[in-house]
Amino acid sequence: MKFLKIAFGTVAALITIAVGISYSWTFTPLGRLEYPAAIVAKLSEWDRAPVELTPESRAVANARVRRFMPKGIDLARIEDREIVANGVHIPIRIYWPNTEDDGPLPIYLDIHGGGWWMGNGFAIEAPTTHLAQNASVIIVSVDYRLSPEHPYPAALDDCYAALEWIHANAEELGADPERIGIGGGSAGGNLAAALALRARDQGGPKIRFQFLLIPATDLVNSDWPSYREAGDRYMLKVSSLSTMFESYVPDPEDRHSPYVSPLLAKDLSGLPPALVITAHFDPLRDQGIAYANRLMAAGVPTQLHSEPGGLHGFLGSNKRRARVQKIAAEAVRQALHD
């Protein structure tokens, strides 16, 4: 009996110490992290293996992200289709919200993130279904081609093809071709910003609103304060960014293009109104803020929301993710509904 008491006491002490140590991880040089987010950040920091952009690592990364995401909500209808542009077959998934509105609905092109090398338009449906229902919009999610197998401009070309398809087929989908929104997170935010620029420059379909969530807007410069502050400590590692940039855009000269680095565009006037959301613990934070400020300076109506305490993608924080989803849904609804 005495041995059992000692054993239980030892185990309890070890658990208390472990909890205390892990709780200390919530205190960082950049401020407090929520406990689950702190665990995510610390586990990522301990993983010092360089990112490998292979099909095998892509499958592992996709599965890891799905584990942190809640399930989507039920919608009126979800349908898979495929569009063909310039001989390329591009899978899309269409989401119709539950609504009593008899008229045509706004339509929104969703562009997934994943560093241009992982993810797809269908695997993580919670944000998509939430936005479709709460903004009362039809959403088309595009499964664009990924690097390194398909470097720039493949992904952007696929997104542009999806935008043109949406405009041409909106009425058949029950949508209004004059009320098109676009958006995406991280690499998807980069592609959405680039898509808005390209549509403006090439006289493409008119976009009424763009939602840029934790976007990468500058694939050239690395002297951002948020790069130095975050380093490799907060889930998205600065050391991995250059690998992803080089995989997506192998030619360094192409990285100066506004369709790759929207922040480097000389003229941002005439772009659609925007919502830009950044995360405090994200190395991409400052370039997202800089892009929002440049949009405002160019006369583009722009909302900027900087989410305190959030990691890139808001992993480890359902509360922050829910708040961001609510802000996005309200902004999209207001912009696309007359």
Regions inferred by a protein language model and the residue ranges of each:
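Alpha/beta-hydrolase superfamily serine-hydrolase fold, recognizing
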Residues: 18-60, 64-338
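N-terminal Sec-pathway targeting helices
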Residues: 1-16
